Amino acid sequence: MGAASGRRGPGLLLPLLLLLPPQPALALDPGLQPGNFSADEAGAQLFAQSYNSSAEQVLFQSVAASWAHDTNITAENARRQEEAALLSQEFAEAWGQKAKELYEPVWQNFTDPQLRRIIGAVRTLGSANLPLAKRQQYNALLSNMSRIYSTAKVCLPNKTATCWSLDPDLTNILASSRSYAMLLFAWEGWHNAAGIPLKPLYEDFTALSNEAYKQDGFTDTGAYWRSWYNSPTFEDDLEHLYQQLEPLYLNLHAFVRRALHRRYGDRYINLRGPIPAHLLGDMWAQSWENIYDMVVPFPDKPNLDVTSTMLQQGWNATHMFRVAEEFFTSLELSPMPPEFWEGSMLEKPADGREVVCHASAWDFYNRKDFRIKQCTRVTMDQLSTVHHEMGHIQYYLQYKDLPVSLRGGANPGFHEAIGDVLALSVSTPAHLHKIGLLDNVTNDTESDINYLLKMALEKIAFLPFGYLVDQWRWGVFSGRTPNSRYNFDWWYLRTKYQGICPPVTRNETHFDAGAKFHVPNVTPYIRYFVSFVLQFQFHEALCKEAGYEGPLHQCDIYQSTKAGAKLRKVLQAGSSRPWQEVLKDMVGLDALDAQPLLKYFQPVTQWLQEQNQQNGEVLGWPEYQWHPPLPDNYPEGIDLVTDEAEASKFVEEYDRTSQVVWNEYAEANWNYNTNITTETSKILLQKNMQIANHTLKYGTQARRFDVNQLQNTTIKRIIKKVQDLERAALPAQELEEYNKILLDMETTYSVATVCHTNGSCLQLEPDLTNVMATSRKYEDLLWAWEGWRDKAGRAILQFYPKYVELINQAARLNGYVDAGDSWRSMYETPSLEQDLERLFQELQPLYLNLHAYVRRALHRHYGAQHINLEGPIPAHLLGNMWAQTWSNIYDLVVPFPSAPSMDTTEAMLKQGWTPRRMFKEADDFFTSLGLLPVPPEFWNKSMLEKPTDGREVVCHASAWDFYNGKDFRIKQCTTVNLEDLVVAHHEMGHIQYFMQYKDLPVALREGANPGFHEAIGDVLALSVSTPKHLHSLNLLSSEGGSDEHDINFLMKMALDKIAFIPFSYLVDQWRWRVFDGSITKENYNQEWWSLRLKYQGLCPPVPRTQGDFDPGAKFHIPSSVPYIRYFVSFIIQFQFHEALCQAAGHTGPLHKCDIYQSKEAGQRLATAMKLGFSRPWPEAMQLITGQPNMSASAMLSYFKPLLDWLRTENELHGEKLGWPQYNWTPNSARSEGPLPDSGRVSFLGLDLDAQQARVGQWLLLFLGIALLVATLGLSQRLFSIRHRSLHRHSHGPQFDSEVELRHS
């Protein structure tokens, strides 16, 4: 909004001067000095005539100097401008003092009203009242404030070469960016760069300005500014107008706030609070039309922002002004004179000159030279600005023959309103159609609402800002707002009236009012509020004069010469008459009136009220103290992309290319895993690099996006996932090294064998696994256990420290603290570690009772030499290489041996079951639930048995997705037994998950969290393993049903499920601590066994040393597969089972439920699986279980009968729960003290030197005391659990064998 350069005042005659040394006083030309006049009205007439001819000369020089400076800010131009300013002040002082000297007693009694107005203006000296030194100081302050504002720049963080000026750079950012952080940076940068340096200058300016105007008889500068409106009730009248208009603003504010909430979300928009000031499309949130695209009521209607059409048609700045001129001439108003086109600056110069870009219209006071200075951009809102500025020029042209003192608007608001009146016609769809910017005009209700809302974003949004700026300045001038409260009061008013808040913390070092042009340039602002009311009064009157009938907002006065004639009369009057008279002649009323404005916006007012009521909007901002948080990674992340269309295009391309790359990688990986050779290893490494390059390429591109600003949740989720480059973040050399280490570790593990002295060698699968499962000979088990760790674990130790270094480096490059932090992030749960600990504590009593019972059974079999009833259990005696599941020693611990056997292996072998038959049965279970059958490719391409052709393969069971929507496979060295039947269902669960989400984008083809993927197959296995289901498969002779049969069944399940809980918990407890550095490589093995003792109550059967690496003997460690997923899976599978049993209509104990053939259960499961990773896992949990949290209650319910029985048995035998003799080992039973010829001691199963052992003893003493306290607490807990369990009904089981998931 340009200030009209026609009124004598500091903001008009004294704009920009550089801060230079004070200029010497210049003598006024004698011909410009006042002569001698009589002190009566006749003399005053001659005085006024003489003043007018002299003033034209002085004002021309002053304006010309200011123009030269504003269009080329240099020191020389500043010096010349200051000279001109001082001369104009000297001229004002000479003539003003003469006017006071001659006419002070009598001028108000003159009969000629125009003469009174002229003398009144001349006698007001303003800054010319000041003595020379202060006058020079005053001029310097004005010039420096203007210079600071006009040359302020905002530079990118750490990039001083990339800096933005306000216009057009920052203005464009505020208008077009939808990035919260970018908008914030531009907003904060401008307010700091322009505002902060101005504060001390503004304090000094205020003091000098008040001093000057007090000498003219005003109480302060604000009183002088208000005097132009010649109304004693002016302030009250404005307040009354504002109150009339406020309801419309409140409804607009609430509607826009809701739209911004849709875009920026809860974090940045409070639906009961103020709106952050940088989000409304404008640096000062004074007009909101630039966010019209975000708030448009009916987006399917024709677009009323014709900017794109203007650009397509090749509009330029000159054409925009020609179009505006043609509107004025169509009303038979004056065309622009030649000087206008020759002298104006209509675009920002391309030659590098510093200019004042703020749009303004200039009167050079010679009655022929009128210019506009505007850095015009080809946009629709700038087209309105063009008409606004040309309105000033038209005013100048119409009153140019009046005396200089009367060349002004009837009041300042009149001058601002004229161009805007025409812009109200220009912006109508009908007029835009006439000038070729709209293809057609639709006047239906929806199009009307679109148009009126667009106008409201410009006109209604501005009202509180137009009102408050001078409320603040009047407070400053009067002293009500001292300099210690400049910023506080500014934001108090902006929140009170506009309902906006600063987006970052502001304090009194800031001077945010100074970041608005009119404050440092000393241009009064209330004129704009007045003009926004007046222009609608004018519009209504001119439409009536033009003969228009219909809705006011559709009126276009284009080509109405009658309207032009009526307007001309107003313009030609200048300020020669009281504005009230001029207004009455124009509209028939002598006061400002909000009714035409309210009438214009009535349709959209009603629509907004209805919308806000429907949405339950709160009008106003009751939570007025709310402020938004700073964005993450601010300000470094400000240049991130937030455009939804660009993000969508990126996601489509990523998905298309990923399907190809991931398919090729999966094929190469499959070929390696099913045929380990140098050639397949080489190809896999190549594909590894290919997929790393793909990940790096698209991950790097994804990091250009600010996911926090994207609104499409699917696109947001995909891009956030793709931004994590994982290992591909590593530099090429380190990535190659990392891939080779992983391959070396995995190959070492997969080809390791343990050999007898006779030369025969055993592999892990199936040989050593069978030994651990079936042998009951202590030494044979020890040989297999120790041999596997010597071959697999020790060999992997050499690679592991470098692996840790590189995986941590990759995690840090992806923004994580370490690799553990990265792995935990997959659960999107900040409290994950605390939640897991809570779940473990809930289940620990069940594990301790099972541990004590099994230890007693092992004591019966192996004797006191090998089993201590108060100590940990040797790790090799539990039927499994890692003692993670104990079901293989069921025969040693079976509660009721005489009850019918539940081992179906013999029946399966007798009936000729094959691995393929086992998977067919699993497929049949899924299809019985209405779920998908596996496709033909599955049967043709899977490896369901260990090859007999001598190939080396990775036997560890795994499920594979080949990313083409039809190829899904399982790799498993299946043995015909019940355990592998359960594993087959587990693996088929992965395949079913793959099939259910196959149509999602590649990045979302995962489980809701990693535990979900592991749980699905196990949920079905919980049904498959029931005696009822095994009987239906003809694998058991009866369904059982007796209490003894139930306890046997639950014991078998507990040996799988409960025994696994502490192991699945501790593996990643160990790795997370390795990754965070709290476990060093020197202590890898010692800390591994500390955790296995603490959580599992196990000890190594032979001493271990630092040279051993027993974690490496577990597949998931060398293969870098996170393990906590299995702990999560074992918890949630029972929650799923309980919920699906309810859906299936099951009644009775949860452990007897079989959901086979329940379509209802299948539907519930399918709905959750189809989500893949597209939603946070609690939503998938809600779909299955009806609530969003992980809970151990279903698992406890499932095993409650067993817990009751175990507790009774353990009490009967006086079992000690836990392992109070925690430092016992089988080796220590044979020999305590130094090992032969070594100088070392066996301690906690570890081979340590004496000093290490002494430190360990002190640590264990502390642990012992802690364990005693824990045991006492546990007793109380068991009592309370037993007490509570009497009042609970049963929940459900789950069944799982952990496997590697190869799908990602």
From Swiss-Prot:
Residues 38-622, 641-1220 form the Peptidase M2 domain. The keyword Signal applies. Zn(2+) 2 binds at residues 986, 990, 1014. CDD domains: M2_ACE (cd06461). Chloride 3 binds at residues 827, 1125. It catalyses: Release of a C-terminal dipeptide, oligopeptide-|-Xaa-Yaa, when Xaa is not Pro, and Yaa is neither Asp nor Glu. Thus, conversion of angiotensin I to angiotensin II, with increase in vasoconstrictor activity, but no action on angiotensin II; angiotensin I + H2O = L-histidyl-L-leucine + angiotensin II; bradykinin + H2O = L-Phe-L-Arg + bradykinin(1-7); substance P + H2O = substance P(1-9) + L-Leu-L-Met-NH2. Keywords: Calmodulin-binding, Carboxypeptidase, Cell membrane, Cytoplasm, Disulfide bond, Glycoprotein, Hydrolase, Membrane, Metal-binding, Metalloprotease, Phosphoprotein, Protease, Repeat, Secreted, Signal, Transmembrane, Transmembrane helix, Zinc. Chloride 1 binds at residues 229, 527. It is found in: Cell membrane; Cytoplasm. SUPFAM superfamilies: Metalloproteases ('zincins'), catalytic domain. It is a single-pass type I membrane protein. The chain crosses the membrane at residues 1258-1274. It comes from Pan troglodytes (Chimpanzee). Belongs to the peptidase M2 family. The modification Phosphoserine is found at residue 1297. The dipeptidyl carboxypeptidase activity is strongly activated by chloride. The dipeptidyl carboxypeptidase activity is specifically inhibited by lisinopril, captopril and enalaprilat. The keyword Protease applies. Zn(2+) 1 binds at residues 388, 392, 416. Residues 1-27 form the signal peptide. GO terms for cellular component: cytoplasm; extracellular region; extracellular space; plasma membrane. This is Angiotensin-converting enzyme. It is an enzyme of class 3 (hydrolase). Pfam families: Peptidase_M2. Residues 1275-1304 are cytoplasmic. Residues 28-1257 are extracellular. GO terms for molecular function: calmodulin binding; carboxypeptidase activity; chloride ion binding; metal ion binding; metallodipeptidase activity; metalloendopeptidase activity; metallopeptidase activity; peptidase activity. Its cofactor is Zn(2+); chloride.
